[in-house]
Amino acid sequence: MSDDKDLRFVDSMGMNGPIFNMLKEAIRQNDLEFEWIYGDDFYKDKNKLTKELFLRLKEKLDTSSIYKTNDELNDLDIRTELTYKGKSVTSNIRTTIHGLQQIKQYCLQDNFDDLTPTFIKKRKYKGKSKEDYSSASSGIYPMRATLKEEIKLDKLDKEVLSFLNNWSHKNKYFRYKKRYSYITHDKLWRIDLTAVKSSNKNVYS
């Protein structure tokens, strides 16, 4: 393979991260989230995904014989600002409000009364040998992959109670997601095509 263009996509990911081990771990463990993500800091073209390309991809998936439509969801993710070692950081716990009606209600009241949010803690995944399996980049294609451990938390968990404490006075980071989900017929692979509107990470609300 003398030309970068000859490299297969997955092979290119293997040059910049443990992509094959990431795939094996994701298949082996149900609580891991493996994602292919558009955009890569190592890719020379920094252009963002355009609305036109997004709609073209959606049309392809809508008419695909490999994937079938799985779901269409509206979610609002909320994380809070923390101070760690004197620096402002975003919490690794997030709450998600599901459905337009509940999202509208939250926006009116800024609390979770009569709502059914979910709580998840995310962290980078490391293998048993402590090898970092958290990310891999292509460098040739505008794509990267991440592997994270997702831990579902109960609303009475100590970490959640701390996360919610003094909620109305906390600075928050919001991400509204309109998600179109597609799944293979064998249910092994899923594509989430998601339009996202988010607040500025450097400016909390």
Task: Describe the predicted segments one by one.
Residues M1-S205:
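Phosphate-end processing signature that detects enzymes handling 5′-triphosphorylated RNA
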